């Protein structure tokens, strides 16, 4: 039976909720903290910052990661920057404006109170990272530098060249290492969570697999924190690292944690296009490039055909024959419109035949104007590593002078096209970041809470560090205040034995199928189904067809999967098979949510619901809520939809406008 979920948002004006919450929350006595264990699954920005912060507070932390070092978490791949409302540029920024831009960018589908809190703590994040030694770019006088990202008309993004995620992760890792050395954090590398253990209705531990030995192990704690990222790799081709998966999140869903807004999947507009059928992942080109790069396609269809045939290059087309379509359609924001808007605009041009590569699925990102105006040295100082990465992959140097027409110098433009990048949906959490399972918390990308239907660029790093450094350390105490009275749990309890036996039984089942198809071949088919039917453009008929195909693919997976090797020891194909099992269920969840939401908003675009100009058309009367899906006991039964009504008090809900 459908339920209405309680987000437990504090009373009072939105600007005072977090301050009031902190003033009245329950605390844990310092001596009692020494008795309490917390499991943190994941060592990316959210997980590492949470583990380090909770360890500093005195809690005993068990921290798990699938890599051989926390430094290999996918947060390291983030390029462009991190948002904060410091207003160093004196350009009109404020906590409220960051809050407003984030809610608007999310197409008014985010929880207002959470977003304001995020904007409020953003400035503390920068101070924390500077104190850790993160080498943010600086102006000549020593002040931290800023640049702009999509969906904003101010410069609020702090950055470290094109390697911001790496530097922020090294900062969090240094704090984590300090706690490991102090004995407050016990780090388990090359371990993967396979199940959550529920005791008396509370999350009290996990079953984890040692990825080297293949052995299953039991771990108990007073609370469990999931920080395992998003589910973009369900699509097979994405900008996510190949190890990224949704197994921990899906296991929590199977055990009773509602999954919120799974259809909100972000398709990033600036990625290197697909170049072959055997490709295993895609490469992101940072949104920061849109500060100085201009996106265009030819105005003339004959020029587009020549580009597709390889008889012309981008540098051969003069300025007057270029269509800078984002600047034309959205003059107030130009190339810095939000990601969902830029991606759909690129798709529209390519669908009309104006694509610029041999597949017709690419547009140009051109730096000629900026290089002519500022000089190549300035551009390389800002984006040098990104230019190097692009050249390494494509053998094209986007900073190299390639042609001169009527006195105007033109460089080789980058070719880009939208690709799966980030997931705004995730495990449902309340204001305290606790799921529908008491004692189970979800932070960072694996929860749904802050971005609505579309995340603004440079806000993922902000949310991950906000949750780990400044939100969870407060809110988890409200739960743990009672736990200090509980006895330490033994992993010999029947709930732990039952959970471990369930995982072992599933491993035996997968190893015993002994079919003929590899994990990758089935995963690639799943990705094709999702991209074709649950991708940038969605329809009722397409979603129903996608669901039908995914159900058939599950049967194929269960009958014809082949996993080489044995269950003991290191077996990467077995681990991938477990991930794929969960990606299939995740793909169905995305489709169910997209099918029920008869509107277009942010990253969810139903082609039946659009304006005459091709923009997203929301239905606030019927869909102004968080869609929360509840598992029904097995993977083949359709989930039940629960709802969390959205309430806005500080912002007027209106149609997004990036034109003026």
Regions found by a protein language model. Name each.
Residues 47:
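N-terminal Rossmann-fold NAD(P) dinucleotide-binding loop
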Residues 68-100, 266-270, 279-281:
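Conserved N-terminal glycine-rich FAD pyrophosphate-binding loop of Rossmann-like flavoproteins
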Residues 20, 26-28, 32-37, 50-53, ...:
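Glycine- and aromatic-enriched mobile tails/lids
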Residues 251, 257-403, 474-477:
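An anion/pyrophosphate-binding glycine-rich loop and adjacent beta-alpha core
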Residues 34-36, 214-223, 436:
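Core beta-strand elements of the Rossmann-like FAD/NAD(P) dinucleotide-binding domain
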Residues 223-282, 451-474:
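Glycine-rich loop(s) and the adjacent beta-strand/alpha-helix scaffold that form part
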Residues 42-44:
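Glycine-rich Rossmann-fold phosphate-binding loop(s) that bind the pyrophosphate
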Residues 128-215, 227, 271-285, 290:
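Conserved redox-cofactor binding core of oxidoreductases
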């Amino acid at each position: 039976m459908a339920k209405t979920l309680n987000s437990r948002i504090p009373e009072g004006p939105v600007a005072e909720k977090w301050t009031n919450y902190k003033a009245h929350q329950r605390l844990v006595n310092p001596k009692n903290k020494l008795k309490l264990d917390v499991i943190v699954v994941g060592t990316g920005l959210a997980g590492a910052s949470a583990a380090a912060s909770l360890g500093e507070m005195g809690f005993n932390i068990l921290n798990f990661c699938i890599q051989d070092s926390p430094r290999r978490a996918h947060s390291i791949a983030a390029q462009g920057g991190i948002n904060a409302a410091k207003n160093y540029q004196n350009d009109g920024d404020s906590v409220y404006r960051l809050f407003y831009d984030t809610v608007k960018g999310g197409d008014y589908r985010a929880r207002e109170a959470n977003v304001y809190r995020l904007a409020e703590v953003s400035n503390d994040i920068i101070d924390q990272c500077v104190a850790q030694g993160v080498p943010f770019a600086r102006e000549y006088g020593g002040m931290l530098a800023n640049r702009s990202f999509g969906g904003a008309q101010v410069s609020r993004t702090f950055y470290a060249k094109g390697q911001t995620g790496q530097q922020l992760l090294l900062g969090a890792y240094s704090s984590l290492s300090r706690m490991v050395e102090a004995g407050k954090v016990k780090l388990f590398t090359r371990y993967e969570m396979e199940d959550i253990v529920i005791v008396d209705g509370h999350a009290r531990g996990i079953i984890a697999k040692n990825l080297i030995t293949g052995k299953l192990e039991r771990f108990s704690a007073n609370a469990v924190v999931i920080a395992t990222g998003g589910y973009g790799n369900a699509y097979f081709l994405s900008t996510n690292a190949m190890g990224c998966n949704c197994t921990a999140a899906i296991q929590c869903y199977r055990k009773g944690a509602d999954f919120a807004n799974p259809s909100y999947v972000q398709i990033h507009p600036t990625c290197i296009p697909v170049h072959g059928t055997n490709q295993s992942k895609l490469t992101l080109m940072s949104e920061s490039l849109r500060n100085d790069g201009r996106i265009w396609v030819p105005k003339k269809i004959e020029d587009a055909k020549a580009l597709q045939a390889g008889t012309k290059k981008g540098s051969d087309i003069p300025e007057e024959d270029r269509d800078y379509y984002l600047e034309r359609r959205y003059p107030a924001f130009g190339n810095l419109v939000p990601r969902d808007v830029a991606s759909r605009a690129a798709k529209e041009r390519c669908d009309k035949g104006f694509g610029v590569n041999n597949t017709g699925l690419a547009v140009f990102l051109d730096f000629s104007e900026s290089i002519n105006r500022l000089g190549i040295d300035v551009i390389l100082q800002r984006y040098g590593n990104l230019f190097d990465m692009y050249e390494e992959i494509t053998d094209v140097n986007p900073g190299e002078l390639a042609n001169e027409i009527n006195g105007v110098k033109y460089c080789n433009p980058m070719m880009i096209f939208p690709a799966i990048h980030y997931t705004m949906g995730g495990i449902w959490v309340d204001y305290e970041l606790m799921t529908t399972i008491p004692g189970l918390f979800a932070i960072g990308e694996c929860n749904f809470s802050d971005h609505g239907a579309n995340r603004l660029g440079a806000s993922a790093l902000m949310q991950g560090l906000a949750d780990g450094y400044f939100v969870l350390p407060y809110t988890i105490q409200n739960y743990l205040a009672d736990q200090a009275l509980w006895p330490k749990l033994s992993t010999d309890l029947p709930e732990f034995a039952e959970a471990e036996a369930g995982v072992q039984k599933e491993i035996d089942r997968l190893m015993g199928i002994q079919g003929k198809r590899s994990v990758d071949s089935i995963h690639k088919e799943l990705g094709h189904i999702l991209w074709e039917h649950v991708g940038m453009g969605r329809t009722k008929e397409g979603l129903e067809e996608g669901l039908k195909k995914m159900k058939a693919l599950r049967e194929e997976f269960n009958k014809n999967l082949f996993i080489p090797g044995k269950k003991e020891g290191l077996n990467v194909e077995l681990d991938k098979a477990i991930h794929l099992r969960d990606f299939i269920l995740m793909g169905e969840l995305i489709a169910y949510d997209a099918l029920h939401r008869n509107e277009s908003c942010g990253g969810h675009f139903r082609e039946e619901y659009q304006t005459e100009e091709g923009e997203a058309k929301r239905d606030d009367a019927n869909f102004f809520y968080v869609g929360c899906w509840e598992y029904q006991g097995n993977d083949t039964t359709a989930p039940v939809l629960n709802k969390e009504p959205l309430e806005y008090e500080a912002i007027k809900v209106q149609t997004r406008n990036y034109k003026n």
